[in-house]
Structures are given as C-alpha cells and as structure tokens.
Amino acid sequence: MASSKPPARIVYQEFGPVADPLSEEQIDLPPQQQNVRIQATRSGRKGKTVTVVSGLQLSAMGQQALLKALKSFCGSGGTLKEDCVEIQGDQREKILAYLLKQGYKAKISGG
C-alpha cells in the first residue's frame, strides 16, 4: 500500500522553483479602474440586513484600510469575507457616496 504522505524531498526539478499562486500578493488597482458593486442582502443572516461591497481589487492591507474607513464613515460594524466588504445595516447610499468621493466607479446593484 502506498504512503499517503507527500515525498519529503524533490527528486527532479526543472526551471527552478515554482511560485505558489496562492501566495502572490494582489496588486492594488487605482480606484478609477475598479468596478465596484454595492448591494444590501439578508440571505443567510437570520433576517439581518448587511451591505456587501464586491468587485474590489485590492491587497489584503488595502481591503483592511477601506473596511476601517467605511466602518468609521457609516458608524457601524463590518467584516471582510471572501474578498467582499460587509457592513452591518442598509448603508448603500452612504457607501456609494463615500466610494464615489474617493474616485471609485461604484454602482448599486440588486433590489
């Protein structure tokens, strides 16, 4: 029976080490080149409304900075989930105004 453990050492390697695609840092795009979508949703949240900002092409540090700024601007809590910023409550209009002021191409989507 074959071992389920991967080999501890590389036997053959051609063209040098291969970069892990998950470890690459995402490059921040300028706000003018980003198409950001803002929507309010309640699905899967026990009836609580959250505003989801998606389409951001920022690094992890950039997303954290934007999250902190949006939470402060809206006066509510929020989190990062799956490259989307979630802000508690229906804050679509406030977030749209803030992002447009920062230079993002933002649009409200959904109901």
UniProtKB/Swiss-Prot annotation:
Domain of life, source organism: Bacteria
Gene3D superfamilies per the UniProt record, alphabetical: SUI1-like domain (3.30.780.10)
Pfam families per record: SUI1
Keyword Protein biosynthesis on entry: yes
Keyword Lyase: no
GO MF terms held by the record: translation initiation factor activity
Keywords: Protein biosynthesis, Translation regulation
A GO BP entry: regulation of translation
UniProt xrefs under SUPFAM superfamilies: eIF1-like
NCBIfam families: PRK07451.1, SUI1_rel
The family this protein is said to belong to: Belongs to the SUI1 family.
Identification of the protein by name: Uncharacterized protein sll0546
